[in-house]
């Protein structure tokens, strides 16, 4: 089902079909999904964005130039994540955790954001355990 909008400005979604890879659910009501900043804004702030210009913070929040930065996910799953990092929260679907950790690392690299010790430990555990041997294409730097 293609996404349709309420007007030509493409600001408000009327209908569509979205797959939430965090929990494996598919939705047809826009009200059932949120657009998730994979690295939440507060997490980015705490990891270095507090020293950025307002323009760079806006670019991060609206980063449409990199496919992994923003995702449509089930609304209550996104709410449960809040501003948590991977040491505090992982997708409920176990098979999504490797991709989530990979996306997290790539986004932090792209935006030159730091990773705290607990976050690093959890990411290393995920990426060296259940993920197996994966190659990550280094994303272009955003700043």
Regions found by a protein language model. Name each.
Residues 1-24:
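Aromatic-lined ligand-binding clefts that engage carbohydrates, nucleic acids, or primary amines
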Residues 18-143:
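Domain-level detector of nuclease and nuclease-like folds
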């Amino acid at each position: 089902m293609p996404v349709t909008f309420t007007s030509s400005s493409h600001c408000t979604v009327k209908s569509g079909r979205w797959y939430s890879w965090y929990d494996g659910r598919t939705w047809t009501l826009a009200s059932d999904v949120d657009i998730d900043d994979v690295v939440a804004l507060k997490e980015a702030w705490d990891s270095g964005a507090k020293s950025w210009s307002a323009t760079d913070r806006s670019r991060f929040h609206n980063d449409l130039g990199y496919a992994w930065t923003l995702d449509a996910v089930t609304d209550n799953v996104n709410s449960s994540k809040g501003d948590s990092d991977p040491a505090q929260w992982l997708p409920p679907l176990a098979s999504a955790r490797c991709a989530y950790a990979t996306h997290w690392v790539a986004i932090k690299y792209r935006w030159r954001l730091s990773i705290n010790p607990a976050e690093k430990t959890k990411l290393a555990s995920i990426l060296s355990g259940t993920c197996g041997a994966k190659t990550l294409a280094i994303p272009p730097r955003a700043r």
